[in-house]
Amino acid sequence: GSEMCIRDRLNGKVSAAINRKLSRNFRQNGVEITPEQWTVLLFLWEKDGVTQQELCNATFKDKPSMTRLIDNMERQHLVVRIADKRDRRTNLIHLTKTGRELEGKARFIANKTLKEALQGLTLEELKVSQDVLRKVFTNIKD
């Protein structure tokens, strides 16, 4: 009952606070991306030239949200849509030079932000909390 509600709010608050901090740290260091764009870039730095559907699956976003996100990232010259050679109807999302060059700085800032967020926690505490969140996710994912 109310316990679940408190936990939901806490988790929501925690991730919202981390995202705000990440946004601020990006901005203050001249990296003009949102936390949502960060998750897309993170995936593309590992595996470039993927379908929009792959990005949806990786980031748990729906099609319309992802379309908007990619549109904005295209306007910022971070990514470009290129028709798939095997299937002209499908666009593959590729990093631009700008998108690739952002990686070092953005990862550095994100790691710094994470360190700030996790300061004072022991490795054991982190491990337990990850295990707990993994179990919760496993319980509720479709």
Where are the regions that the model predicts?
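Short alpha-helical transmembrane interface motifs in multi-pass membrane proteins
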Residues: R7-D8, T96
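Charged, amphipathic alpha-helical coiled-coil/dimerization segments
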Residues: D71-D131
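N-terminal helix-turn-helix DNA-binding core of bacterial DNA-binding proteins
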Residues: A16, R20-S65
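A cross-family signal for key residues in well-ordered alpha-helices
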Residues: L42-F43, N57, G104, Q130, ...
